[in-house]
Amino acid sequence: DGFNAAKEGRLNPFPTIEWYIHTTVDPSLRDAEGHHNSALFVQWVPYELKGTTWEAEEERYVKQLLSVCDRFAPGTSDLVADTFPLHPKKIESHFGITHGHIHHVDNTFGFADRLPYATPVQGVYSASAGTHPAGSVIGCGGHNAAIRLLKDLGIEE
């Protein structure tokens, strides 16, 4: 239902959420008081909302997402001191990513053939979220582009 909701300009009330708590693996990311930070990455969020705007819906949707978190980790929303929501229009504005899609294209089977690491411009390689296996904070695109570069230079791994 998430894809259809986004396609129709609706916000899914129970979306797929990838919940990252970065400070559990890198304590240096905690603030001066030792607070954790986390990110909720929500799949299938529309760029344009039907019948409303992101400005009108942002705060409500953050609360909705936290209520989903509360279902699986009761009390989570009570622990949140601050939020920094990045809906697609803010992602586009803040990071310059067209239509605010951090993976550039959808991560579906139909898009398994992503951008090549070696571009048509000699010596220019791509290691972005648009390359296989896509985005998130995993570094695989960079690793794979480096392997391709080594191969092109005739250097064995």
Say what each PLM segment does:
Residues D1-L86:
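C-terminal segments that line or cap access tunnels to active or ligand-binding sites in enzymes
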